[in-house]
Amino acid sequence: MRKLLCALTVMSALVIAVAVSAAAPGNFAGTWTLDKSKSQGLSPRMQNAESVSWVITQTEKEITIEEKVTGGNPPAGGAPGGGGPGGGGQGGGQGRGMGGGFGGPRTFALDGSETSGEMGGGRPAKFVRKATVSADGKTLDLSSKVTFQGPDGEVVSTTTEKLVLAADGKGLTVTRHSESPRGTQDSTLVFNK
């Protein structure tokens, strides 16, 4: 009987330890301001902007990122660049990504499932997004794929972002890789709360 009780106690402790180790995502929510002096590979729009910020809202189930760019002129001869990797919500994101110039909030499910939908605007498009949370909850890997019809056929833009929350929760580093018909862009964005 004692052996059974001891075994049950050990099993219960293991179950509790596993449950605690499956960390929830860190708190990425808040308004984050880009520190251009610490960031690398910024687009001309971001370099010339008066300010760039991310407004992140987060619940247990999802995270939404809205990029806001104030000031700064679009690059000559093209659509504005340097915003988020394709929007996909209705509303006011002013940044435009390399992949087709779609602004607006981007929402990702935090359970690891894909989010898909359609975007309106000048070029109707389809998007697929996925978020993966690290075991410690301090890193979030985001992937986005936007597909739309261009004058020469289907255009695809993909973006991956690794969001790393600082230990004190006051810094956010984003490593971004984007690919589109305009080329490949790698950048590191450093934000402060």
Give the label of every model feature segment.
Residues A7-V18:
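Bacterial N-terminal signal peptides
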Residues A23-K193:
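PEST-like low-complexity, intrinsically disordered acidic/proline/serine-rich tracts
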Residues M1-A7:
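Positively charged n-region of N-terminal signal peptides that target proteins for export
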